[in-house]
Amino acid sequence: MPQGQLFFKTKNTSKQWVDAYTEYGMSLEDGAIGEIITPAPMKEGVSNSLATADGVAYMAGTIGKKNERTLSFNIHILAATEAAGWTAYRKFCREVLDPQYVQMKIVDGTEPFPTYLNNGVETAGALHLLFRSCQQVGRYRMRLLKWTLTFAEPNPSVRDNREPSIMN
């Protein structure tokens, strides 16, 4: 994934979008985009299954709601030297993972993901994620670092660029 395709924004990046490739030498591994663009699961609606009636009755307004989802995908950092690999890794952890709350977006060709409807117009948005864990997959003399990141997306219906409310 070359420059201009994967972006992060956190309080440690001065709330500005940062190009992952330019800043950290980071790219998504094969299969990562498929994991990221997979639709969120739906919540089970509130229902009542009475023995005296056929079928199941669902309470109005309780169906069609998205559930929290977990995203796990592989990334890698490619650096010119071992020292540059360590520097990029530490900078990524400090700027993107340490704040825990992360916004992420992808631009694949000219198509942004995610998008949302803004007054009927499809508009580029952002995934609002909470960092959960990082599992090291492998390294080659610190020039090529590969690992798996896991995030929670608490509310997949929020895809606009505003700051979501987080409970205190």
Q: Where do the PLM segments sit?
A:
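Extracellular/virion structural assembly segments
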Residues: 1-168
